[in-house]
Amino acid sequence: MSKEKIVLAYSGGLDTSVAIAWLKNKGYDVIACCIDVGEGKDLEAIKEKGLQVGAWKSVVIDAKRDFAEQFVLPALQAHAMYEQKYPLVSALSRPLIVQKLVAVANQYGATAIAHGCTGKGNDQVRFEAGIHALAPEMKIEDPIRDWHWSREEEIQYAKDNGIPVPITKASPYSIDENLWGRANECGILEDPWAAAPADAYDRTVSIEEAPDTPTTIEITFNEGVPTAIDGEEMPLDQLIMKLDKLAGSHGIGRIDHVENRLVGIKSREIYECPAATVLLAAHKDLEDLTQEREVAHFKPLIEQKMSGIIYNGLWYSPLMKSLVAFIDESQAVVNGVVRVKLFKGNVICEGRKSPNSLYDKNLATYTSADEFDQEAATGFIKLWELPDKVYAQVQNKNKKKVKENTSDAY
């Protein structure tokens, strides 16, 4: 009789390696699945390690391009920033990982999926809500949430099951990273008054260490999609990686944020999002040039709602699909080039041009070349002010009547 199969979201670290043994001891054939969203890991080494520690099968998937095009791009076009500050680094990768885990489960006939999230964070919700949105009958296991071990007990379990324990200096931080950025928490960062030390950062230099000379680049967008830097076209994932290094070298993208977690607690996080910071600024700048006024004023409502949906793990909800449809429609006119200066932590959009520009210099100028019909303003103002004017007239008339009636009473 064949064993029940389970797909484990596998990182190659101690926690998920121990999870392989724990799930095996529970009676599963474990399919270790490592999905690369831009962490820079050695996929082949992770694949081999999964087999060495007891996985029935080990699968690695390079999903950087899918991540960039299917998940990062909609968030960029929606200017998705949780609480107006966090570009949703980890939250964006979870629905992509879920998508791949479910696909692998279907491929191998697995009846369950396992993840390695704690019972205190947002990710457990994102994984499980996403899995059940795509595969409602799929069973879910969470070894780390279930076993309640101390670090010492986990290490002993690893030794008992022949799992190599890495002998390295323990990092005080908990780090998650992908193409779109790097998230760091724990250690001294748990004190919101303490300044983040230098070793909390990896993708960015400090403002003090940033070059004294700015770098100016031009970013090209086609229907809201960044397609080129300084005229050099490249796939979105490569563009993000290139821009990440460049912007990070100028100290751009450091975010120190105390955020409201889905599970009800506040958490202090240090984020590094160099490419995201630049692209969000440039995309918004081009939209300012090309979006019609009512669309431009309404779109932030959609952006805020989408940010919350992504953060709270509801990427596959019906509402998300509807909101993305609005964003897609709004991007048809977002074509052009934005000139951006990078300097000591600052992103300065200093020029923009577009074939869809709604800026008309002849209407905007205050010189003799002005084509704006100022005489038309008089009639427009009379119509525009009419509701408030009539309201004021009626109120004044009623106040006068009340005053007269009061005088007559005496």
UniProtKB/Swiss-Prot annotation:
The keyword Amino-acid biosynthesis applies. Its EC number is 6.3.4.5. CDD domains: ASS. It catalyses: L-citrulline + L-aspartate + ATP = 2-(N(omega)-L-arginino)succinate + AMP + diphosphate + H(+). It is an enzyme of class 6 (ligase). GO terms for biological process: argininosuccinate metabolic process; L-arginine biosynthetic process; urea cycle. Pfam families: Arginosuc_syn_C, Arginosuc_synth. Keywords: Amino-acid biosynthesis, Arginine biosynthesis, ATP-binding, Cytoplasm, Ligase, Nucleotide-binding. GO terms for cellular component: cytoplasm. Disulfide bonds: none annotated. InterPro entries: Arginosuc_syn_C, Arginosuc_syn_N, Arginosuc_synth, Arginosuc_synth_CS, Arginosuc_synth_type_1_subfam, AS_cat/multimer_dom_body, Rossmann-like_a/b/a_fold. This is Argininosuccinate synthase. It comes from Limosilactobacillus reuteri (strain DSM 20016) (Lactobacillus reuteri). The gene is argG.
